[in-house]
Amino acid sequence: MRKVRRVLTGAGRALSPRQMRDENGLLVGWGLGTAVFPAVMFQGQARALLRRDRTGLVELGAQDMGQGAWTALAQIAADSLGLELEKLEFQSGSSDLPDAGIAGGSSHTATAGMAIHSAGAEVIAKLAELAMGDERSPLFGAGNAGVLARGGRLYRRDDESRGESYADILARAGFAEIEGRGSAGGDPFAQKPYAMYAHGAVFAEVKVDPELGQIRPTRLVGAFAAGTIINPRLVRSQYYGGMI
């Protein structure tokens, strides 16, 4: 509603047509359109690897048709492994890699992203198990308190002053790397007990020359609920492209 107020300012609009004009005599109209689209998740897989040299690798057969999917998926991959983006090697776009589902139906980020997240979570769980079971680790015995992964290190959730690097954990355990695999989605067409949709609204102000019939949109405002936004710049560009 805050978006509505920004557009529909003033003393209010007349309900009958052709009642509003601007200072140049052009007819002014206001309109509202709603948007709804199913939030679908298909089946997909991904593979993640954490190396002793403090780098990570994520592999999946996801496609990018120019919508910026690889950028968003690489961000999810780095976050799932608790690494900076520049420390991550992201491999995608090959049928030799794990099948990450189709790039369509506004489902790709959710499908491939969930597979990546699951693969990264498995890597971190294996790493945490090594540390929490090692008496030489400051994470020893963390147990139910658990750990969190950030910046190439694991920390105790109940005391973030206690932690150590991935490299130290792997070196002490004698591992060069740890691998995890993840999957996403079931049958997208199976009957579900609930529905998931992205939704939104677009508000428009349009001016019409009553003599020439020329139509010119002068203001557009969109408000959308599309779940967690991974890359705001990418999403903003897609919104602009769809509206304009």
Segment roles from a protein language model:
Residues M1-R6, G10-I244:
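Cofactor-binding beta-sheet edge motifs in enzyme active sites
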